[in-house]
UniProtKB/Swiss-Prot annotation:
Organism the protein comes from: Drosophila melanogaster (Fruit fly)
Function: Catalyzes the conversion of oxaloacetate (OAA) to phosphoenolpyruvate (PEP), the rate-limiting step in the metabolic pathway that produces glucose from lactate and other precursors derived from the citric acid cycle.
Superkingdom per UniProt: Eukaryota
Involved pathway(s): Carbohydrate biosynthesis; gluconeogenesis
Binding sites annotated in the UniProt record for GTP: A313, C314, G315, K316, T317, N318, R431, R462, Y554, G555, E556, N557
Chain segments annotated as coiled-coil in the UniProt record: none
Keyword DNA repair annotated: no
Name of this protein: Phosphoenolpyruvate carboxykinase [GTP]
Example of a GO MF term: manganese ion binding
UniProt cross-references to InterPro entries, sorted A to Z: PEP_carboxykin_GTP_CS, PEP_carboxykinase_C, PEP_carboxykinase_GTP, PEP_carboxykinase_GTP_C, PEP_carboxykinase_GTP_N, PEP_carboxykinase_N
Subunit record text: Monomer.
Residues noted as binding Mn(2+) in the record, renumbered to the chain: K270, H290, D337
Length: 647
């Protein structure tokens, strides 16, 4: 990163690529309450390991905070944070619930910013495939080391003047688990600290773990301030014009500026758990994936664990918290968003949820769609950009049936709202940040340091036409091809364009930490490392010619999981098809279903549709990935093409 003062130079052993400035380096003179001459407002500097302390000192030199707060994760500390957030007007209390708070952000800071999210490597091709000339690449953004340095130099010097720098030690995964990794985030946002306390294992226990083995990901975050010095909303400072999120995998470094929104500021989540996580996983021979993890127990008491990768708005959280309609089946939740998976010494693929909470999209969550989530979120939760009610509660689209009469609603912008307002009360990307341990169906092994054994992996998306309810990959390579070819319906940014089918390989398109072609090769290599699970593709969203969903979804999805369990147990309850194994006639248990399902139609494979699908996948692979895609994936596409020709 940039040199900030004349003749400063980066010395060997620099822990994070931030400048180590010889002129400014000084001993702390044994003072407990200062670090580099900056007062410690909370916490004990003696708990910092050598590497953490060096990182903090570099952050102080760069950002120039007024004081430093070393987080311990305690209840007492949380009260201090909540008090400061209340005083700043960042949050308001929700007296209807137990220890719940509502934050309203600057309206310009409401979501992840893909166009400003970069991976920094020496060579561009390490980060992204080279698309065909004239085609815009969609598999990540690369930035050179010199441009990253310049971006930091333009934004960070002095950005924490007048503010507190919080030192946030956090563990992704149970503290001490062989599958876990540690991070240190430096931030000037108390909202981030309070949220990280929910989303990660945060505090003194992490520093004690680092004292045993000092390996950690460095994460630097500032909400920033506009270059003109005018803060629009003092309760939510940010700098939307200059927001940037940078990752440097070679140095396990994340740098984020200008946004307080969760995906850009809670750096343990997508930045660490997926982007940096996937690069570490490649080096160490494991997988860091955008997947839920659930446990399902059949009527005989036999339990299996399944992971599933779906793009956003395709029901990951709903499946992770499934309430099965099939009698005597039980689903339990290990995680709803991210899975880290590694083979154990016996070659069994084991997964942990590296997170400690749920950062879920609120709108659409209701007692009808996800009663388990609704029974999770109304205590110890930070809500962001949902609407509030006059009786001290919250509201979002989907909660209409639970509204008491005569309750007034204030929308996410702080304005009065009625159902005739013509716009949503809650922002479409509004969130709840809630502890996972509160989930009524949290799995008993959700914090098992060894992880849970994975028997099946699901890929899926929102496909209104052509794609059957469920099919199984023929083998591992075919399964990897299915993941690479994933597509899902998304609403185009411009409404008049209507719905478009977007490519979202492995549901990871915004989160790859390195070249997608190398990522696919890494997935293919897993077969040589241990016992790989079976792979399936599901589609809950196929529609009839009349535009009605052909499958009722929600609890009825347990019927699909039952068939998956039968296949995992080796039952030959399938027939082969052009695209993979589908349930044999009568093999999908439909007993007792209220809705009549046209089984023939929901498993039909229209030749015209699949011929076009093959063409679209080929165009995507050739234009976006080209020679970087392993030859065996092109071979899978050729084989699919010839099978479709014979439909």
């Amino acid at each position: 990163m940039p040199e900030l003062i004349e003749q400063s130079k980066i010395i060997s052993g620099n822990v994070c690529g931030l400048p180590q400035l010889h002129k400014l380096r000084q001993d702390n003179c044994g003072l407990y309450s200062h670090i580099r001459g900056i007062p410690i407002s909370y916490g004990n500097v003696d708990l910092l390991t050598t590497g953490v302390r060096a990182f903090v000192e570099e952050g102080i030199a760069l950002c120039q905070p007024d004081q430093v707060h070393i987080c311990d994760g305690s209840e007492q500390e949380n009260k201090v944070l909540i008090k400061s957030l209340l005083e700043a007007g960042t949050i308001v209390p929700l007296p209807k619930y137990d220890n719940c708070w509502l934050a309203r952000t600057n309206p310009a800071d409401v979501a992840r910013v893909e166009s400003r999210t970069f991976i920094c490597t020496e060579r561009r091709e390490e980060t992204i495939p080279t698309p065909v000339e004239g085609v815009k690449g969609t598999l990540g953004n690369w930035i050179s080391p010199s441009d990253m340095d310049a971006a930091v130099q333009q934004r960070f010097p002095g950005c924490m003047k007048g503010r507190t720098m919080y030192v946030v030690p956090f563990s992704m995964g149970p503290v001490g688990s062989p599958l876990s990794k540690i991070g240190i985030e430096l931030t000037d946002s108390a909202y981030v600290v309070a949220s990280m306390r929910i989303m990660t294992r945060m505090g003194a226990a992490v520093l004690r773990q680092l004292a045993k083995k000092e390996e950690f990901v460095r994460a630097l975050h500032s909400v920033g301030a506009p270059a003109n010095g005018q803060v629009e909303q003092p309760s939510w400072p940010c700098d939307p014009e200059r927001t940037i999120i940078l990752h440097k995998p070679a140095e396990n470094l994340i740098v984020s500026y200008g946004s307080g929104y969760g995906g850009n500021s809670l750096l343990g989540k997508k930045c660490f758990a997926l982007r940096i996580g996937s690069t570490i996983a490649k080096q160490e021979g494991w997988l860091a994936e955008h997947m839920l993890i659930l446990g399902i127990t059949d009527p005989k008491g036999e339990k299996k664990y399944i992971t599933a990768a779906f793009p956003s708005a395709c029901g990951k959280t709903n499946l992770a918290m499934l309430n099965p309609s099939l009698a005597n089946y039980k689903v339990e939740c290990v995680g709803d968003d991210i899975a880290w998976m590694k083979f154990d010494s016996q070659g069994v693929l084991r997964a942990i949820n590296p997170e400690n909470g749920f950062f879920g999209v609120a709108p659409g969550t209701s007692m009808e769609t996800n009663p388990i989530a609704m029974n999770t979120v109304f205590k110890n939760t930070i809500f962001t950009n949902v609407a509030s009610t006059s009786d001290g509660g919250v509201f979002w689209e989907g909660m209409e049936s639970s509204l008491a009469p005569n309750v007034q609603i204030t929308d996410w912008l702080g304005k009065p709202w009625t159902k005739d307002s013509g716009k949503p009360a809650a922002h479409p990307n509004s969130r709840f940040c809630t502890p996972a341990a509160q989930c009524p169906i949290i799995d008993e092994a959700w914090e098992d340091p060894a992880g849970v054994p994975i028997s099946a992996m699901l890929f899926g998306g929102r496909r209104p036409a052509g794609v059957p309810l469920i099919y199984e990959a023929r083998d591992w390579t075919h399964g990897v091809f299915i993941g690479a070819a994933m597509r899902s319906e998304a609403t185009a940014a411009a409404e008049h364009k209507g719905k478009v089918i977007m490519h979202d390989p492995f549901a990871m398109r915004p989160f790859f930490g390195y070249n997608f072609g190398d990522y696919v090769a890494h997935w293919l290599s897993m077969e040589k490392r241990g016992q790989v699970p079976k792979i399936f593709h599901v589609n809950w969203f196929r529609k009839s010619a009349e535009g009605k969903f052909m499958w009722p979804g929600y609890g009825e999805n347990s019927r699909v999981l039952e068939w998956i369990l039968r296949r995992v147990n080796g039952e030959s309850c399938y027939v082969d098809s052009a695209i993979g194994h589908i349930p044999a006639e009568g093999a999908l248990n439909l007993d007792g279903m209220k809705d009549k399902v046209d089984v023939k139609e929901i498993f039909s494979l229209p030749k015209e549709f699949w011929s076009q699908e093959v063409k679209d996948i080929r165009t995507y692979f050739e234009s976006q990935v080209g020679a970087d895609l392993p030859a065996s994936i092109y071979q899978q596409l050729d084989e699919l093409s010839s099978r479709v020709d014979n439909l």
